[in-house]
Amino acid sequence: MEWELNLLLYLALFFFLLFLLFLLLFVVIKQLKNSVANTAGALQPGRLSVHREPWGFSREQAV
């Protein structure tokens, strides 16, 4: 009885951590897609984009 409870607990913990890992991965991929989309939009010459000063770039990167 004791080892069945332990097994159930370990399985629940394992699947919970797996779920958290996939959630984290999903959020990171979403952020990367947003970052790539913003960069691609800024680099297209046809669009009006906000001009970034080189001295303000490092401050934006830090935030």
From Swiss-Prot:
Superkingdom, taxonomy of origin: Eukaryota
One Gene Ontology term of the molecular function aspect: transmembrane transporter binding
GO cellular component terms listed in the entry, alphabetical order: plasma membrane
Chain coiled-coil ranges: none
Key words of the record: Cell membrane, Membrane, Transmembrane, Transmembrane helix
Pfam families in the cross-refs: SMIM43
Region (Important for interaction with SLC2A1 and SLC2A3): 7-29, 51-57
Annotated compartments: Cell membrane
Record-annotated membrane-spanning stretches: 9-29
Membrane keyword on record: yes
One of the GO biological process terms: mesendoderm development
Topological category with respect to the lipid bilayer: Single-pass membrane protein
Subunit and interaction comment: Interacts with glucose transporters SLC2A1/GLUT1 and SLC2A3/GLUT3; the interactions may promote SLC2A1- and SLC2A3-mediated glucose transport to meet the energy needs of mesendoderm differentiation.
Described purpose of this protein according to its UniProt entry: Required for mesendoderm differentiation. Interacts with glucose transporters and promotes glucose uptake. Probably augments the glucose uptake capacity of glucose transporter proteins to meet the energy needs of mesendoderm differentiation.
Listed name of the protein: Small integral membrane protein 43
Source species: Homo sapiens
